[in-house]
């Protein structure tokens, strides 16, 4: 978990490299291995900055509770910037929580950088997507599929983007049903639906189904429609049930960690 300092700051081991020390450039596979070994070197959260996408710049974790949080000092951040462009923030979670915390997401959005997380011997790279709640609708940019894709990304499953122009649901393009099938989803019945499943709605009679919602706990849904609303979480009400065309589940649903969504929502709610 990231704890915001007075400026932006992150964590380093007891021995920290000096700013004038040369850092080797790594291939992607070697860099990933170095990051995982670095994470395994401590029972506390470790952190680093990635320089030019190729170099690891370890930072000291100066947070008073390093077992659960991390903080990078101004001095380490500034020293890293002297080495090159900071292109990502790296840290570890010693606890088995392989998604960004609410505090992590708050600071990731502020930095606008990819955040890389080591947990359970694996490395995940998170894009700096906007918070899930409160987005303004722009078709093809921040629309219902963008929200669906970004939410799944924060939960550990990456989906491709696809080109779409307004009114596709009136031209027989049927983008949702075609792309869901092509990207590892299969239909389930309403009685089988569980949190994390994707509800596809058909709001316009005679048109293709064109709206996606993610089912959450307590019969809530996360979605972003074109009715002038911001992206939001709300009850799965009767009107939505009547418009439901189908419900879909990803074949890697066991890897979908919904704590990624709840952490982001908690960050946005504070």
Q: Where are the language model's segments positioned?
A:
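Glycine- and charge-enriched low-complexity intrinsically disordered segments
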Residues: 234-270
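Short acidic alpha-helical/loop segments enriched in Asp/Glu that coordinate divalent cations
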Residues: 158-168
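Second-shell loop/turn segments in exported
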Residues: 132-138
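Extended, compositionally biased flexible segments
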Residues: 81-94, 223-224, 230-231, 235-246
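Active-site nucleophilic cysteine motif
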Residues: 138-155
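Conserved beta-strand-loop surface patch within small alpha/beta domains used
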Residues: 1-88, 94-127
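...with weaker cross-activation on analogous glycine-rich loops/strands in unrelated enzymes
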Residues: 166-231, 236
């Amino acid at each position: 978990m990231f704890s915001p300092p007075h400026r932006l700051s992150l964590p380093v081991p007891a021995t920290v490299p000096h700013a004038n020390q040369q850092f080797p450039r790594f291939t992607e596979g070697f860099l990933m291995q170095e990051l995982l070994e670095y994470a395994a070197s401590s029972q506390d959260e470790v952190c680093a900055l990635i320089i030019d996408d190729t170099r690891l710049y370890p930072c000291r974790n100066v947070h008073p509770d390093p077992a659960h949080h991390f903080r990078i000092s101004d001095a380490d951040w500034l020293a890293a910037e002297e080495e090159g462009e900071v292109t990502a923030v790296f840290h570890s979670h010693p606890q088995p929580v392989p998604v960004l915390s609410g505090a992590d997401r708050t600071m990731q959005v502020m930095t606008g950088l990819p955040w890389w997380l080591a947990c359970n011997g694996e490395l995940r790279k998170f894009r700096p997507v906007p918070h899930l709640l409160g987005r303004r609708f722009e078709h093809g940019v921040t629309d219902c599929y963008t929200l669906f894709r970004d939410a799944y990304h924060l939960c550990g499953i990456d989906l491709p983007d696809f080109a779409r122009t307004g009114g596709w649901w009136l031209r027989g393009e049927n983008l949702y049903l075609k792309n869901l099938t092509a990207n590892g989803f299969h239909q389930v019945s309403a009685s089988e639906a569980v949190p994390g499943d994707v509800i596809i709605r058909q709001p316009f009679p005679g048109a293709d189904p064109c709206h996606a919602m993610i089912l959450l706990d307590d019969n809530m849904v996360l979605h972003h429609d074109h009715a002038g609303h911001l992206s939001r979480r709300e009850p799965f009400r009767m009107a939505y049930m009547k418009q439901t065309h189908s419900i879909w589940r990803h074949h890697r649903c066991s890897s979908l960690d919904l704590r990624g969504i709840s952490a982001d929502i908690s960050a946005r709610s504070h």
